[in-house]
């Protein structure tokens, strides 16, 4: 009888080829996380919550012409954090990756953000720091990465306690593998 078990690292990187990179800035108390692999891949999305902030997630619908993506970004910074995917796109374009339009390749990097603007970090910057955070996260992709207060989880909170970045994997036999990565920044009281 086949049974469920966690992957060797209990991480999304237990899924063949997937890599994750984190970058954060302790001064602004925010960061970005990138999920990618060496080749494009398929993805899907479910958008929930009262005020979701996303970019390029519409392309993940099965009726769209873009079948594969090149990366996914999770970032803090509310709407400012969506710029982290621009930094990742710069890196991918430098590797000649992306959706081939016939003229140029356009890296497809859906992203989602969390609200960490009231966590006590410095937010009076004049130049949006998230493009650079996205680039730095991409340059650090690996099959081994930090969870907790790293990357998109750096400034995440759950009301009065710390939120953060988490990951898991589950295998059903040798053929079915599921991985997840999440930046938890919920509202309400944990008590």
Which residues does each PLM region occupy?
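Alpha/propeptide regions of enzymes that mature by internal proteolysis
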Residues: 1-191
